[in-house]
């Protein structure tokens, strides 16, 4: 690693030393020596020493069941500590001093100034800026909350140690705390013993909001204002809302039978309780601060004559928040509320108005410094979080709505809705939506499945407008899918319009998105209720699983482009909602690059994007890291709108069409076309064993008896990441590029790399995947776990992978992967030394596990789970 990363090197070394000290203390010298020997063999094996490689295999293959857990834990915990050090590096003083990121807001405003950008245009674009992060509980977070808390404290210690003026005594105190935290982590079980409930997942999300985003959002808004003021010459409005937080936790019932209407209601109550708790803490501190006596005449007229007018207002709010806390505490405990709704705070404006009045009065009386202190932070929090802490999305699969309406139509004698043509469905739905009479008979008893759908709609009807952000329909295929949800919401008595969002996920559905939305927009009733606003969700994970990375990404691009053009033509304001994950197979890419690779004008109404599983912690888990993440998102959105990427040339489109067809055929030829593929996949990866790891509340399969097509995209990608073949992220992509180059179109491919962010980002993502893949390790899985007659599949895939790596290197004119990002290459090289033993241990453990699955040694099962979480930590992005 370069000199710039000396702090990172030193921190990793120190954390490793403290971990060794902990292991020696807890397990004894013999275990520590065994671990150290494995580490040295792994390092030498990576350096090309064949004898060391064989010795590594022999050592790990002969390890006793008794010793296997501490060995697995040692390498897993070191990788977690490396992640902490790397996360800290991005926010360290050294990093800040060494480079002002070219992707930051401040650098963007410098470029805008250099290019004489219109102040008016910049002002309009900044005022429209919207970053809406949707937190999801997808089961890719393999680290327990108990450990996450300790990891945050370790990060704080690293921050303190970076101060160069520490005395030896002060340094020793911090290092002792660091050692203790590492020891606490070692003696904490890293594997959950029970699968979290949806309510547990929601509490995890709210804890992250409280511990990180509550501090980060006001700080980011201050930085945004300061940076914009340098360019604009004036402050942004206090009421600006450039950040919004939404959540799927407690609302996403797609394939998760444990998310019920009752769970949704409980999570909504808990969110309001937590918001009241956090605002009460803020308001109590504010009551101490606002001891000023002077206020404006308007303020005095509105709130009365008081010696300390601001305190009077703030104390009233404190009383209301205390009552709010009690009210929702009673609801959560199933007690009759002790206070009435008239005594509590239910809407943002009940908090905003009196506090904004305080703010304006303080400004008017020359107390700007005080107004811009804690009070401004609270106003920013009201704008972003509101009194519900976050908005909730409801998500359900399209056929569940079809089945519910079909049950109704059968009962009332209209026939089976599910069997009707699309035209007949639409005609029926539009007729019922326009009718004033109810469709559902009062005393009807539906099936439990339909009752659950109706109960969910009733919970929505009980909420005030704005609490539910939208209703997302997964696997949306037709205009009737959207109209059906509107009808169910109408029948439940929802008194206002809720955005109903189709999620287009498969290749065919993405290609049909424009046609489906055109049909919807042609429905007069529909145009009348949407108020010329439409949200559409683009699915990244299922489309990549369906067609491969290259074909899926081009389908996503084309769908977005078509929807932008369609809505512009009709005067409809379009928000694109991106369902991305952390991995390449699920649309993951560095945030800035990913956003600048979107079609022109697709971000003009802001960004709505899912933040999933482990990526929430990596990108938002610490206040300073979250501020950096918001800065990158804001800078990319503003750049995409003010300095838009080029429209792709016709010849580039033609090449992408060819790449898409070729890559999809190759991908599906393997995944769907080879009868041996499913048994090979099940043997060569820990896919079946993954279901034993209690990561999230949602089952891994939509249909427990199905094949790959029934497997959720997340475990599909997670499994391939474990055996280092990383297949979903590259299969078909490199081979299609190679075919196009062999057709004599290499010059066009090179121009696309140099001049088109969409294409260059795809190549960069492939390079990152290739640098984390490992054909030798993948071969070990095959040789120990796969029947010989299936070995040909692994051999063919590894040959394709090696050929694809050479193809990508020919585009970058480099001899090594990641040559242009040496510190990432160094980071991967360092991780490999610790991840390789975990992979080889996993092979050994899977072999032992599968030999006698009915009588598995508990130590073997526990160690296997540890290797899964350890490899996830080593790879950084799991699913």
UniProtKB/Swiss-Prot annotation:
GO terms for molecular function: magnesium ion binding; phosphoenolpyruvate carboxylase activity. One of its GO terms (biological process) is tricarboxylic acid cycle. Its EC number is 4.1.1.31. Gene3D superfamilies: Phosphoenolpyruvate/pyruvate domain. Its cofactor is Mg(2+). Keywords: Carbon dioxide fixation, Lyase, Magnesium. One of its GO terms (cellular component) is cytosol. SUPFAM superfamilies: Phosphoenolpyruvate/pyruvate domain. PROSITE patterns: PEPCASE_1, PEPCASE_2. The active site is at 138, 545. It catalyses: oxaloacetate + phosphate = phosphoenolpyruvate + hydrogencarbonate. It holds the Pfam family PEPcase. Forms oxaloacetate, a four-carbon dicarboxylic acid source for the tricarboxylic acid cycle. Belongs to the PEPCase type 1 family. This is Phosphoenolpyruvate carboxylase.
